[in-house]
């Protein structure tokens, strides 16, 4: 467990994000909120079609979610109240600032919804191709400087041992007091 200067508790967890109990689960989404692969597909498969249905309604009403921004739906059958769909950048196409924004806006949205805990995957490291090292560095720096309102606990959920090991090493160097 790590703690940022503002008391935010940060946990690294190796496992399946769809099994985590949290007020919100962050989904690594695309702009059209079409949850067809990776963590997005796993979230809809476990949480139920309602998540995709609400996502479709969101895009119909508000248009595609810009890269670096977030949208919110219910969490269906997941052990959460909400899914925060964060649209991360594609490696080599959109910049690191968009990844920083997607992470920051996810935390901000959790506070806007008065949540105390969220689970977050390694955004943009799947089909969008971001190296774990870059994602971990950006995430650790955003978390280090984030001043929460109601948010108390952030669980970074990593699916593979490789991802977990990289995040642990980088989080140790950036977040260890």
From Swiss-Prot:
Disulfide bonds: none annotated. CDD domains: Macro_Af1521_BAL-like. Residues 1-175 form the Macro domain. SUPFAM superfamilies: Macro domain-like. Pfam families: Macro. Gene3D superfamilies: Leucine Aminopeptidase, subunit E, domain 1 (3.40.220.10). It comes from the Archaea. NCBIfam families: PRK00431.2-1, PRK00431.2-3, PRK00431.2-4. This is Uncharacterized protein SSO2899. It comes from Saccharolobus solfataricus (strain ATCC 35092 / DSM 1617 / JCM 11322 / P2) (Sulfolobus solfataricus).
């Amino acid at each position: 467990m790590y703690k940022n200067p503002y008391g935010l508790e940060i946990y690294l967890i190796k496992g399946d994000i769809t099994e985590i109990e949290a007020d919100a689960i962050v989904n690594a989404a695309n702009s059209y909120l079409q949850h067809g692969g990776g963590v997005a597909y796993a979230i809809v498969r476990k949480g139920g079609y309602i998540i995709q249905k609400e996502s479709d309604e969101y895009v119909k009403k508000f248009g595609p979610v810009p890269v670096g921004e977030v949208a919110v739906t219910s969490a269906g059958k997941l052990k959460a109240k909400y899914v925060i769909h964060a649209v991360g950048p594609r490696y080599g196409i959109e910049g690191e600032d968009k990844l920083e924004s997607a992470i920051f806006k996810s935390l901000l949205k959790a506070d806007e919804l008065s949540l105390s805990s969220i689970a977050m995957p390694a955004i943009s490291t799947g089909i969008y191709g971001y190296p774990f090292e870059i994602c971990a560095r950006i995430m650790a720096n955003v978390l280090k400087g984030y001043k929460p309102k109601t948010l108390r606990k952030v669980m970074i959920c990593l699916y593979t041992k490789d991802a977990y090991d990289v995040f642990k090493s980088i989080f140790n160097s950036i977040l260890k007091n």
